From Swiss-Prot:
GO function terms (MF aspect): glycine hydroxymethyltransferase activity; pyridoxal phosphate binding
Swiss-Prot/TrEMBL GO biological process terms: glycine biosynthetic process from serine; tetrahydrofolate interconversion
Gene transcribed to yield this protein: glyA2
Name of the protein in its database record: Serine hydroxymethyltransferase 2
Disulfide partners: none
Enzyme kind, highest EC tier: transferase
Species per Swiss-Prot/TrEMBL record: Colwellia psychrerythraea (strain 34H / ATCC BAA-681) (Vibrio psychroerythus)
Site feature location: Plays an important role in substrate specificity: H229
Length: 417
């Protein structure tokens, strides 16, 4: 028998201690990983609710289990809010992750062995855009495009050339480490010229799109996927969106369930619905604008200190720092900044001589620091401290001094007030 007041503490102290330590880490560290953010307490409340008990295979009104009348309401609210938020005619809120949402798109639109054209992981793409270590590169014939070496921006002429040469059945637009606005219409035109599907993965910029601060691909692409965390600031999960197309909707639904997943996670779907409502509410546009402003301030400050920002700046929430000319690896920079309580992630840069396990760059993003209240002043100061560490990366005294400043900044700006 279970009781409502049962607690982890005192029952499983090993797990509780790790949870408490992670809570302290989040409070005492500055989070600059572009794919991470903080959810609201409301989102966490839904994820820790009794909804986790309910199996609900199928879709609202068409379940394989009884007792789904209330979770049907929840899932339909999530669907309706997602469609309103992104101007879509179709939404599937069941994917457990962005990668599973992407896998469903592949399954719905392609046959094994057919050709896809996506951005190279080494140039800012994602594993599921055709990497050889992913299902997308193992099951399908993946061709990869990259960035223009001179500008650090997508080489659309290369995309067009590769599309004509390889005749892919699907072109993928989207990224995991690209700081500029993507020309969705240019991709549409290229796809149309060869009769290919256009699939957009907007996982990183979905929050900016929802706020109207980044071009919306939904009216342009055949299918759009996103995660529900990152800039969208919701629970970890996936989402598929599309325009009106009944045949395509049927294929996508079948690719999610039963082809790719079994029962949906109703506690996560409830959290998604709450996240969408938050994104439709007051203050959301201002938050996303501050995310962009903070990223631009950081990129500008890095450049002032003599650091190379790929593409020369940013139009969204992230940018890549190229450390090749500094003689520093991304791995060493990541570790040194971690000791200063600044969390980043090492990242490959275009034409990186290092392996993906070492890299020559850092990916830096501002969604999380903006969620805890950082503005331009804090963003500039933080960037200066990062430069101090990287300028003298073996100096532990400098790292200790920066760590003290970071702790003070974090204390003044708690994650949850």
């Amino acid at each position: 028998m279970f009781y409502k007041n049962d607690q982890i503490a005192g029952f499983d102290d090993s797990i509780w201690q790790a949870m408490e330590q992670e809570d302290k880490r989040q409070q005492d560290h500055v989070e600059l990983i572009a794919s991470e953010n903080y959810t609201s307490a409301r989102v966490m409340q839904a994820q820790g609710s009794q909804l986790t008990n309910k199996y609900a295979e199928g879709y609202p009104g068409k379940r394989y289990y009884g007792g789904c009348e209330h979770v049907d309401v929840i899932e339909q609210l999530a669907i309706d809010r997602a469609k309103e938020l992104f101007g879509a005619d179709y939404a599937n809120v069941q994917p457990h992750s962005g990668s599973q949402a992407n896998a469903a798109v592949f399954m719905a639109l392609l046959k094994p062995g057919e050709t896809v054209l996506g951005m190279s992981l080494a140039h800012g793409g994602h594993l599921t855009h055709g990497s050889k270590v992913s299902f997308s590169g193992k099951i399908y014939n993946a061709v990869q495009y990259g960035l223009n070496e001179a500008t650090g921006e997508i080489d659309y002429e290369e995309v067009e050339r590769l599309a004509k040469e390889h005749q892919p059945k699907m072109i993928i637009a989207g990224f995991s480490a690209y700081s500029r606005v993507v020309d969705w219409q240019r991709f549409r035109d290229i796809a149309d010229s060869i009769g290919a599907w256009l699939f957009v993965d907007m996982a990183h910029v979905a929050g900016l799109v929802a706020a109207g601060l980044y071009p919306n691909p939904v009216p342009i692409a055949d299918v759009v996927t996103t995660t529900t965390h990152k800039t969208l600031r919701g629970p970890r999960g996936g989402l598929i969106l599309a325009k009106q197309n009944d045949e395509l909707a049927k294929k996508l639904n079948s690719a999610v369930f039963p082809a790719g997943q079994g029962g949906p996670l109703m506690h996560v779907i409830a959290a998604k619905a709450i996240c969408f409502k938050e994104a439709l509410g007051e203050g959301y546009v201002e938050y996303q604008q501050q995310v962009i402003d903070n990223a631009r301030e950081m990129a500008k400050t890095f450049q002032t200190r003599g650091y190379n920002v790929v593409s020369g700046g940013t139009d969204n929430h992230l940018f890549l720092l190229d450390l090749i000319d500094k003689g520093i690896t991304g791995k060493d920079a990541d570790a040194a900044l971690g000791r200063a309580n600044i969390t980043v992630n090492k990242n490959s840069v275009p034409n990186d001589p290092q392996s993906p396990f070492v890299t020559s760059g850092l990916r830096i993003g501002t969604p999380a620091i903006t969620s805890r209240g950082f503005g331009l002043e804090e963003a500039a100061a933080l960037t200066g401290w990062i430069c101090d560490v990287l300028d003298d990366i073996s100096n532990e005294q400098v790292i200790d001094d920066v760590r003290s400043k970071v702790l003070d900044l974090c204390e003044k700006n708690p994650v949850y007030r």
